[in-house]
């Protein structure tokens, strides 16, 4: 069952049970569907800002991560990302958050006995859908 992050989790005490329930659903989900804030063209890297109400676990725990962005969210590289983040907010914080997740493909590692393992630290598969137009046909 896919899980989608609506970015609406409150910090109120009664929402603790909702968050726990949501977390359990994410932990057992096979597919996680998210948006991303940017995509870096040079490295095909997804950029996801962590903000209150968002849940990074949707992009990390399920075996398959599906991300959806709009065409205008594709930027050239890291220097352009920094410029975008610097000017999208207001001083003194600008658009920077306490955490940026950079995703450049499915999880894989060869640090144990030099054997390639997929999905050790995140999804085994990653799919990106780019929406070119949201205008009504």
Which stretches of residues belong to each language-model region?
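The feature marks the mature, well-folded catalytic cores of soluble enzymes
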Residues: 1-137
């Amino acid at each position: 069952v896919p899980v989608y992050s609506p970015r609406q989790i409150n910090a109120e005490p009664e929402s603790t049970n909702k968050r726990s329930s949501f977390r359990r659903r994410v932990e057992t989900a096979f597919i996680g569907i998210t948006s991303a804030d940017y995509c870096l063209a040079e490295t095909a890297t997804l950029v996801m800002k962590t903000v209150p109400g968002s849940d990074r676990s949707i992009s990390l725990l399920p075996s398959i991560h599906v991300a959806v962005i709009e065409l205008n969210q594709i930027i050239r590289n890291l220097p352009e990302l920094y410029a975008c983040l610097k000017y999208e907010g207001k001083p003194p914080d600008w658009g920077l958050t306490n955490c940026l997740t950079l995703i450049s493909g499915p999880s894989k590692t060869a640090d144990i006995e030099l054997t390639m393992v997929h999905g050790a630290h995140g999804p085994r598969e990653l799919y990106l859908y780019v929406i070119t137009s949201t205008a009504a046909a």
